[in-house]
Amino acid sequence: MRTWFPYPLLSIALLLMWLLLSQSVTPGSIVLGLVVSTVLAWVTLNLQPARSRLHRWSRIAGFILRVVGDVIRSNIAVTLIILRAGRRPVNAGFMTVSLDLDDENALALLACVVTATPGTAWLEYDRRQKILLFHVLDIENEDLWRKTITRYAADLKEIFE
């Protein structure tokens, strides 16, 4: 049974998601969902994510609170930008920042945080030069954005490395 469903919980979760998204529980939808979820579970067999150890558990709560606070502030800022769209020009642009992170999971988490923050998007990371390229909806204060990203990176470095 393990060879048919290498990750049973993943297969079940994908099947349930399929049924929710298709808004149908017909036999055909269930069979198609089973096929898709099983194939995707087989595909994930080849993925071998890097394992990381968390070194400073005490920093995790502070990091989460900081990110939540920044996401709330960004939501408000983006809302104001949208509401004032005709009165004030939007100053969007690209920025680069040097990162001192080596752990792949820390980089992945940083990418999730940057992309989940309204008004920002992670675009590219150069591993050799350790430079992040990201987009900001309102690039009014470049130093603030650089400090925010480097602060996240420093927190993640303490947690993961």
Curated annotation (Swiss-Prot):
Residue spans crossing the bilayer: 4-21, 28-50
Keyword Cytoplasm applies: no
Similarity section: Belongs to the CPA3 antiporters (TC 2.A.63) subunit E family.
Alphabetical keyword list: Antiport, Cell membrane, Hydrogen ion transport, Ion transport, Membrane, Potassium, Potassium transport, Transmembrane, Transmembrane helix, Transport
Subunit structure as annotated in this protein's UniProt entry: May form a hetero-oligomeric complex that consists of six subunits: PhaAB, PhaC, PhaD, PhaE, PhaF and PhaG.
Keyword Ion transport: yes
Main location: membrane
Domain of life assignment: Bacteria
Taxonomic source organism: Rhizobium meliloti (strain 1021) (Ensifer meliloti)
Annotated membrane topology: Multi-pass membrane protein
Identification of the protein by name: Probable K(+)/H(+) antiporter subunit E
GO molecular function, one term: antiporter activity
Pfam families the UniProt entry points to: MNHE
Record localization: Cell membrane
